[in-house]
Amino acid sequence: MPLCKRYVACLKNYAIMSDDVKKYTVEEERWNAVSHSVGIVGGLVVSALFIKEVIAKGGDGWALASVLLYMFGMLSSYTFSTLYHACSPASRWRKKLRKLDHSAIYWHIAGSYSPITLIAMRDVGYWGWGIFLFCWLCAIVGTSLSLYSLKKHNILETVCYVLMGLTIVVAMKQFYNAVPLRVFLWVVGEGVAYITGAVFYSFHKVKYIHTVFHFFVLLGSVCHMLAVWYVLNTML
């Protein structure tokens, strides 16, 4: 229960900080930017490997599209996060990049679901397409909230992030039965990494804690990359 309370506290803190951006030191922002720039480099390398794997395995158009959506979401998220943290607080681009940073989180989440739903679960009743459409609909709505009225809807935005992230729980049994065990375990590991990062994020007054949070986001991404790799490797 303490972990659950800490996670709830994190969500409340995130909503508050979305409205009044925390002022990080120059050194903190440097590390915040550097940490997610690692995600850009890793994402580019993995993108090439995944696309090559889909083509080599003779994957259909849906498989390729799902991987492209995943790569788009992940790279957009890390790119805008890096640019936002690297941008001077005095720059007129700072607020615009913040909106894009928040929007790209939706794309990252929806993109991450795409290979799982369009390859591993596409033929599992209506679950694959249902989750895919739900997540991308949430991403569209969430992007609108972030771009046009971020301050007014920061709590709603946080709820959208959480709902999207937990969508797979609704079809956990179907997902477990549809994929190899190691895929399931890597996705579980991803969830643990993100929740752990959220717990650390709740200590937002601690110096460099945002960089620590970024580390767990990267760890979650690595877990998901491995899950998708095994989906491509075993299910195409």
Segment roles from a protein language model:
Residues 4, 11-236:
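Multi-pass alpha-helical transmembrane bundles in non-GPCR membrane proteins
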